[in-house]
């Protein structure tokens, strides 16, 4: 079995101005607070759920 968890690279491409508070806090939880900032996170269910909530602000790449 392959127990390797793939990583995803998430880049914020749009501003959080005008978004709901829960979406802003989701971005902060992902480690994003500025446009064009990127983070590499493990591809887990909780991270995918957070990304799904703010996918209109992000660019997602598999690694």
From Swiss-Prot:
Pfam families: Ribosomal_L30. HAMAP family: Ribosomal_uL30_B. Belongs to the universal ribosomal protein uL30 family. One of its GO terms (cellular component) is cytosolic large ribosomal subunit. Part of the 50S ribosomal subunit. Keywords: Ribonucleoprotein, Ribosomal protein. NCBIfam families: rpmD_bact. GO terms for biological process: translation. This is Large ribosomal subunit protein uL30. It comes from Rickettsia prowazekii (strain Madrid E). The keyword Repressor does not apply. One of its GO terms (molecular function) is structural constituent of ribosome. SUPFAM superfamilies: Ribosomal protein L30p/L7e.
């Amino acid at each position: 079995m392959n127990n390797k968890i793939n990583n995803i690279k998430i880049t914020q491409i749009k501003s959080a101005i005008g978004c709901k508070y829960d979406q802003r806090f989701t971005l902060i939880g992902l480690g994003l607070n500025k446009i064009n900032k990127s983070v590499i996170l493990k591809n887990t269910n909780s991270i995918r759920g957070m990304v799904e909530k703010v996918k209109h602000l992000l660019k997602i790449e598999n690694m």
